């Protein structure tokens, strides 16, 4: 005892004495630690086994978590309408094909389509459906939302309806639509003047409201009762059909092979599901004000479709025919026809040569071979000078050493025409599109006079879209000597569609 209270005196046996005094404390602390660790382990095991919905927004009141879901907004501000939102990706041609699919889905499900902006080329990438390597629907939705807000902040927002003419669709009541900017203003409670200017500072209340809206519409926090239903099925699991007479839920013919399953550790099984039975009348999704898809891209693949197989359904034949070809707005078509008549001034061949991007850069020779064969055939039929309009991603200063370089030197037999990035008429066409502001003319929810004024003053297009590409496609639609496109290019498919519907003569 004296040793314990008198530290100045050395203790011959300090450790045994110390242990006697601390045994009870050590046992107590050890017991508490074990209990804490035990409860932590139990919590995480329990958490991992609980249904995700318990920790998602759907487990709570949407109006508490998201003010945008208050009943007065859904019933009064949005007039009780049901909306469809989706997440486009990649270049313009892919975005256009998704837009057409979105129009069909909106028509089938009787929802108002939220018209998206035209995204920067490859600003949002989906991935590869055939390889079962894609972004999840919630990931691509939040990417598209963020990029859309970035376009607004940087004054580069152009609506799909500013470029593509949907006036006949809307006037015939085939579909209902609303501009993304106006919808975001109503849903998120952000004034149009603030939304459409570069004053959208990241620390502002408006920016925070939009950020919260993004979380809501992306579905990253789950569904919200009567407000949002986020579709999580994508091309890895689902092929959407519509009243085609087949059994709902049957296996699709295209499935991942065993090698891919093993390599990617896949357990996905692709099933064909009727979109109306799954998301239409009488379903959980029907009650939600907003139905949010991910990507709506599809393409034929190995005897099936990657994601959407509704285009041959007899029930929507009329709508499919109306959506099949959506022409450019008149300003673009006039510019293309004017270039053909006033600059080329002769019958011409159009060559669309995609040489730099993605897989196409590895197939230059085969791309050039198609053009060579077409020109050889034309030379036999039409001896003399052949005019060729070239639309390509290969800059002119890189033509040396390529077939294009050889053609440009052969001025006796060929005359090449192309649109330069600095051509004056591009800026003129952009200005005309800005003035027209076609995207503001459509909306299922009437605008107040104040909103109309703000849209016209602050939300007009700002030339951020690739007007050159659209005009080049319009020029190619007028090529009387034919068209040579790059195999596998969606741009080539778009030009072929324009030529099929005689866009040049009918515009």
UniProtKB/Swiss-Prot annotation:
Transmembrane segments: 26-46
One of the record's GO molecular function terms: glycosyltransferase activity
Protein family according to the UniProt entry: Belongs to the glycosyltransferase GT106 family.
Topology with respect to the bilayer: Single-pass type II membrane protein
Enzyme Commission identifier(s): 2.4.1.-
Glycosylation sites: 110, 146, 398, 410
Keyword field contains rRNA-binding: no
Gene3D superfamilies: 3.40.50.11340, 3.40.50.11350
GO cellular component: endosome; Golgi apparatus; Golgi medial cisterna; membrane; trans-Golgi network
Organism: Arabidopsis thaliana
Domain of life of the native organism: Eukaryota
Species lineage: Eukaryota, Viridiplantae, Streptophyta, Embryophyta, Tracheophyta
GO biological process: one example: fucose metabolic process
UniProt entry keywords in alphabetical sequence: Carbohydrate metabolism, Fucose metabolism, Glycoprotein, Glycosyltransferase, Membrane, Signal-anchor, Transferase, Transmembrane, Transmembrane helix
Pathway(s) served: Glycan metabolism
Compartments in which it is found: Membrane
The name this protein goes by in its record: O-fucosyltransferase 30
